[in-house]
């Protein structure tokens, strides 16, 4: 029986080992914005195979329904005989293959949304975000294979972090499993490509679009940022890394991958303060190659591509990264200590001055990213708080706490090194929220129940002076109470339109709603600037009669000015020499 079981096991392993999925990606007519995809499946024993297209892109927490871009799915066997294809659910197709050892599945993907998380194709270039283009075989995400890119005749280059299968075949790539495949975006066209070395890693930059960049400046400055990032973790796991940069009108940020990133920036961003912001984006996305792609909760890899993957730790994944994308620019010499504190001051005042900060805990903001952060509405500022900025402030608290507790011997860098080594290097896995908290408590030497209750699972306003005590930073509370309209306006065709209303404000009490047009005040026609100037001149208790148009119906509302208390803090360096500050803001 044991021999029989062993033989059976070997046969099964052989069958699984022989399974491959090969993709052919072509674009014969870029002006119609369609990629043509052919999947060649070999070695699958099932008589019926289900193939699916993901509903989301890892790193961007929103169900995007990529299957909406696919019109028709066809399948044949190795002899070219048509196979039955039945749509099973919104993003899944079932193929009856019978005993066929080879199955060819073909479909076209509409690609005309140029962002870091979606795909695009026109006569200037093509960009593939894998999760929106490549289907996978259900229950076989671990299957390996090849990708053959067939560029349009006018395109000469393909840039991707996927390894080339053979040196003499520049457009044939290989992948180890589906996660690997879709974690490597592909730029196709005539992009500018250059290389540089930093931290012992070859870095390639592929730039689409004109801009005011200078190649040598990018090499120098990106290298400085990368060197500082690598020092945080004391090692860089990559041998090669790719930056895909899209120079466009409306830059949209970046998206992280394990050994590459895509950055979307305004084409004129490469000078002055805008260039420093660009370097901050570089720092942010590059930091993710450790924090998110390797240091991660269980929910962030391997992925379930058919539905949301919930975690309450985005305040760590994105918040810690946001803290370091500024701190590392300080270490690299792009900020002074005062400039860094000014950045932190702005973050603190943004968070504490937001109504939503008193409503949504940062752990909840993480979990609800799928339905709130990526789907904002006119009321979002009253009910939500970004885990990016709030998380960066929490990271600063923890950094200072570790520095103070160790008298300047250790900092948050060392904690990140610890969990990177424990969970990624040695265990090769993610962690739970409780495991993260336990490791943090062990490293800081403190019970963090109250800290979590106040700042992670709660919405308390921190005592900033106490938290930064002993760090050579003076925190001044300049919270003020002033008359406040409680509404924001936008101008549309010369009309003053209400765009946002703060909850429990004078505007809300008066009955104003978003999208109302304010036409007049006390019998006089007013513009947006008139209203804003008038509101600034009012004292608490003063009244106005506003003429409103809502859904083309005119009516009046009585407005009474009320006060609003907005928390605000100033952060300044003290004049004293401070060992802990010197270590923190080095």
Describe each region flagged by the PLM:
Residues 19-56:
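Early extracytoplasmic/domain-onset interaction patches
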Residues 192-314, 320, 324:
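Juxtacatalytic substrate-recognition/specificity segment
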């Amino acid at each position: 029986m044991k021999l029989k079981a062993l033989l059976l096991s070997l046969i099964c392993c052989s069958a699984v080992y022989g399974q491959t999925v090969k993709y052919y990606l072509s674009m014969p007519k870029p002006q119609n914005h369609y990629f043509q995809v052919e999947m060649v499946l070999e070695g699958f024993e099932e008589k019926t195979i289900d193939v699916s297209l993901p509903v989301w892109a890892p790193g961007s927490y929103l169900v995007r329904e990529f299957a909406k871009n696919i019109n028709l799915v066809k399948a044949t066997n190795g002899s070219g005989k048509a196979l039955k294809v039945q749509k099973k659910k919104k993003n899944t197709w079932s193929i009856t293959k019978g005993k066929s050892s080879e199955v060819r599945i073909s479909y076209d993907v509409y690609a005309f949304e140029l962002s870091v998380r979606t795909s695009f194709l026109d006569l200037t270039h093509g960009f593939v975000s894998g999760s929106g283009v490549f289907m996978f075989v259900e229950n076989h995400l671990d299957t390996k294979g090849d990708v053959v890119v067939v560029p349009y005749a006018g395109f000469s280059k393909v840039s991707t972090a996927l390894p080339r299968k053979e040196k003499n075949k520049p457009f044939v790539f290989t992948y180890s499993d589906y996660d690997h495949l879709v974690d490597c975006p592909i730029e196709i066209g005539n992009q500018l490509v250059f290389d540089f070395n930093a931290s012992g890693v070859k870095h390639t930059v592929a730039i689409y679009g004109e801009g005011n960049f200078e190649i040598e400046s990018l090499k120098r400055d990106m290298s400085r940022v990368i060197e500082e990032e690598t020092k945080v973790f004391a090692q860089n796991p990559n041998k090669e890394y790719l930056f895909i940069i899209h120079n466009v009108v409306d830059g949209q940020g970046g998206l992280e991958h394990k050994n590459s990133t895509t950055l979307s920036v305004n084409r004129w961003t490469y000078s002055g303060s805008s260039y420093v912001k660009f370097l901050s984006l570089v720092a942010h996305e590059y930091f993710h190659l450790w924090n998110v792609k390797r240091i991660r909760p269980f929910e962030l890899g391997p992925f379930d591509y058919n539905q949301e993957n919930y975690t309450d730790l985005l305040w760590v994944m994105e918040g810690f990264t946001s803290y370091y994308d500024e701190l590392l620019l300080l270490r690299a010499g792009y900020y002074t200590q005062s400039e860094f504190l000014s950045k932190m001051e702005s973050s603190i005042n943004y968070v504490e001055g937001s109504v939503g900060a008193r409503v949504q805990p940062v752990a909840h903001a993480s979990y609800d990213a799928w339905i709130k952060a990526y789907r904002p509405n006119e009321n979002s500022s009253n009910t939500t708080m970004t885990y990016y900025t709030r998380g960066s402030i929490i990271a600063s608290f923890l950094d200072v706490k570790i520095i103070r507790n160790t008298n300047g011997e250790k900092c948050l860098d060392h904690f990140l090194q610890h969990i990177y080594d424990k969970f990624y290097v040695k265990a090769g896995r993610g962690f739970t929220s409780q495991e993260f908290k336990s490791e943090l408590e062990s490293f800081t030497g403190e019970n963090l129940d109250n800290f979590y209750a106040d700042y992670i699972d709660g919405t308390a306003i921190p005592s900033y002076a106490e938290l930064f005590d002993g760090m050579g930073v003076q925190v001044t509370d300049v919270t003020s109470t002033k008359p406040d309209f409680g509404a924001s306006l936008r101008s549309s065709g010369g009309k003053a339109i209400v765009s946002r209303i703060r909850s429990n404000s004078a505007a809300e009490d008066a009955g104003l709603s978003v999208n109302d047009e304010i036409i007049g005040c006390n019998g006089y026609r007013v513009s947006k600037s008139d209203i804003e100037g008038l509101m600034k001149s009012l004292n608490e208790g003063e009244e106005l009669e506003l003429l409103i148009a809502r859904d083309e119906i005119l009516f009046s509302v009585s407005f009474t000015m009320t006060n609003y208390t907005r928390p605000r803090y100033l952060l300044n360096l003290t004049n004293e020499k401070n060992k802990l500050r010197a270590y923190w803001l080095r």
